[in-house]
Amino acid sequence: MLVLTRKVGERIVIGDDIVITVLKIEGNSVKIGIEAPKHVKILREELYEELKNENVKAASVSKDDLKEVWKNDKGYKRPGPSS
């Protein structure tokens, strides 16, 4: 892990297209601004962990659960082109 010390207004550049700016420091909180291309996902760690856990849950559905969903949904017709 690289550890840097920055003051308000100072920046950190990552690669060619990500810039992190220290905007404000108040007590234990540091407000930062992040400039990055739209395709770069930027998430707070707690949201990232929550999404990861939800994905694990979704991927661990049992065969019995899937059978139950299909049984309860067998009247469903997928919309298609009108003929």
Swiss-Prot record:
InterPro entries: CsrA (IPR003751), CsrA_sf (IPR036107). The keyword RNA-binding applies. It is found in: Cytoplasm. Its main location: cytoplasm. GO terms for biological process: bacterial-type flagellum organization; mRNA catabolic process; negative regulation of translational initiation; regulation of bacterial-type flagellum assembly; regulation of carbohydrate metabolic process. Gene3D superfamilies: Translational regulator CsrA (2.60.40.4380). GO terms for cellular component: cytosol. Keywords: Bacterial flagellum biogenesis, Cytoplasm, Repressor, RNA-binding, Translation regulation. One of its GO terms (molecular function) is mRNA 5'-UTR binding. Belongs to the CsrA/RsmA family. A translational regulator that binds mRNA to regulate translation initiation and/or mRNA stability. Usually binds in the 5'-UTR at or near the Shine-Dalgarno sequence preventing ribosome-binding, thus repressing translation. Its main target seems to be the major flagellin gene, while its function is anatagonized by FliW. Homodimer; the beta-strands of each monomer intercalate to form a hydrophobic core, while the alpha-helices form wings that extend away from the core. HAMAP family: CsrA. This is Translational regulator CsrA. It comes from Thermotoga neapolitana (strain ATCC 49049 / DSM 4359 / NBRC 107923 / NS-E). The lineage of its organism: Bacteria, Thermotogati, Thermotogota, Thermotogae, Thermotogales. The gene is csrA.
